[in-house]
Each structure stands twice: as C-alpha cells, then as structure tokens.
Amino acid sequence: MRKVIFSGLLLLCVCAATASARGRVGAGYLVGGTTRWDAMGKQSYISHGPLVYARWSVDLSYYLDLDFGAEWRHQFMPFPSGRIHPVSGLPAGEIFNEEYITVPLNLNFIISTADMGALRFLDYVGVYAGPRLDWCIFSHNGSDRTFSFIKQDYGYRPLNLVAGLGIYVIKGKWSFTLTADHGFLDRCAKDDVKIKNDWFVSFRIGFEFGR
C-alpha cells in the first residue's frame, strides 16, 4: 500500500513539473500534532507522524495561487481505557494507528515578505482555504483489561473545509503551518455518511523542496 502511495506522489511531482511554466511543484516531509473537538465539546490529541506530501501551485495573480496535491500521513493516538474511540466506535485501547490519503485543493492568499525588513528571511506568509477529500485506512492496535484486538477499516471523508496559516522560511527549506479543519461529513469506518461537527487544529513543521 505504501509503495502505491509513494508512486502516486512521485507521479504527481513529475506531472506538475511539466504541466505549466507558471506552476511550482514541491514535496515535503512534516511532523506535528492535532487537537480535536467533537460535536459534544470533548477534546483529544493526535500525533502525526510522518506526513509525506506533494503539491502543485499555479499562480493566479500576484497575491493568489491555487494548490493541488496529495499527501499520505500516519498518525497515532494514545487512548485510555474506559472510553470509546471517536471515529471507529471500537472499545478503548492503548494505541490506534491510522493511515490517511488526502487530496487537498487550496486557494492561497500570499503576502510576500521580500520587502518587509526584519521578515526578509521569510519566503512568504500565506493564508489558505479550500475543500479536502480524505481516504482513511485505520489499523487499530490496542487492548483494554479484558482483550486485545487488531482491526482495519476503510472509508473516506467526502467533505472537509480547511483554512490555515503557512509560514515558509527560506524558500524551498523549512515550513511551518497552522490549520483549522472543520469536518462536515464522515464516512470513515462507517457504512453510511454521518453528519459531523468536528473541529481539528493542527500544527506542522517540516522540510519542503521544489522549484
């Protein structure tokens, strides 16, 4: 499965690099974490690690560009006994491993920092928003006091709206992003589409290369 994912990311980079002289292609490796609030106001924390992605940006104007990409991420969440996993509905366990394939489409409003004096070391600060489609592959490895289990589920999230702040330090090097993600519909590990009202706030730091 991972070979397929990485092959797809590589193909995306190749296609994007040859598609348009006005476009930019990049790929990167990120780590970070997410704090989640569900519809009932309950909070949980998820660690990301790693997230590998590729993206293609097309300049629409001096201040706007359009990002299309794909990413694969692995995340794990320590989960205490006596509770139910918020996505799968499985009994409580210790560690839940989850794989995601994501296709984001973001519209970025770019603020160039080339002439900002003390901020000259930054490439740009950007605010972005757009829809995102997630394919979810869950591998739950956990146990409680009575039994152990390993379970896999497949699903997708048909609609997520994402907004965030990106700070790119020294072009083509390090990037820092802060995102707020509101999931409306959820079909991950479920047979039918559920109406969701979950908020996710993520911080990511990583390395990106490209042109």
Residue ranges and their predicted role:
Residues 1-24, 210-211:
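Cleavable N-terminal export/targeting peptides
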Residues 24-32, 69-71, 128-132, 177-181, ...:
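Transmembrane beta-strands of outer-membrane beta-barrel proteins
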Residues 20, 24-26, 57, 65, ...:
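Ser/Thr- (and often Asn-) enriched beta-sheet segments in non-cytosolic proteins
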Residues 34-45, 74-99, 135-157, 186-199:
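Flexible, solvent-exposed loop segments that connect beta-strands
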Residues 55-142, 201, 209-211:
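Gram-negative (and chloroplast) outer-membrane scaffold detector with strong preference
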Residues 19-58, 208-211:
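Short glycine/proline- and aromatic-enriched beta-strand/turn motifs that initiate or cap beta-hairpins
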Residues 69-80, 152-211:
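Predominantly the C-terminal beta-signal and adjacent terminal strand-loop region
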